[in-house]
């Protein structure tokens, strides 16, 4: 959801406006997000009604996925690391559509950009400073779903030479094996009425191929003594579209085992993250533990024969073992939406682009995690939880409204096996929780405050 979307028929921006008031209206007004639903024409491939105009330039928010930080700092960092601003192509895409569809658009845009850059006068000058004065090649920097687009564009796209013309790919929080959070989105409200934004997202997500492409493909369905992958029938049972699930399964089967050229994965760690689920009578119960298989595909079990559980954490949305197809990762204690904005992540991007030896950022605070509600009610206390430390010494936690009208401390105290702070915000709006551990990059997450209205389906 990191691209601003524009409705060409109405002339309205339908995702990504720069104020919290728009977010509140989008998630709570009766027709707030109606324009984002895929139409029958769009499902048949007749596109053009909605266009992606640019990358997000202002914070956004969604139930379950929570805060989505803008890409201004990432684009600025990349631009400072290249020979000329014309060497950089920000690629916005309609995230409602399938990975396969957007991958085709990405492959075409990347090829055109490379050919245009190779004709640019600054390219000829830059070659004089490169080993063997070689021609410029592509480097992809991709956050979240963008990494799946890049994988599909380079390994199964229409341009068979694109991978050979690529020097490297840097992914940040990409769910290569999907995310349990996507299943939770589709299942919202199956058991009971839910907050209005959550129900609205479920109805919206049901129409979206892109959301179905983010469903977990690893063994995550807990059936007691057996753990297996979700099938299209399971996805229909939990609230998804079976046809879209079949298409998504075909995509992931095609991409499984494919390697990205020069890949480095930045992976969020230590944040509480959904990793598995049960599905009973159409209701999903998600858990913060996963399961592992031996090299022969057999499930790891304990001495009683029960499946062995592992809490590997993640970035709050994508669990650690889904965020990279290999074990070669750069771990960062950051939330998913902030992975493309934190100072440590931006330093890793700079290092990757400039081909310096990369040892990864300092890991002093790598085990600290933050947990906040995605939606709160103004005037009602709620809790920030901090995991991985047992003392508030050296920690500063604060809450501020993104628009700047409110700011205040969140005083941490000991609460069982973690720290906590009780917070109350005065008015509807988008708020940023910041936990400063003394490391270069603080932990941040966005919370939407809105009236407590229920969606009963």
Language-model segments: residues:
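N-terminal non-catalytic accessory region
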Residues: 1-141, 145-190, 194-201, 316-320, ...
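Secretory/organelle targeting and membrane-embedding segments
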Residues: 147, 156-363
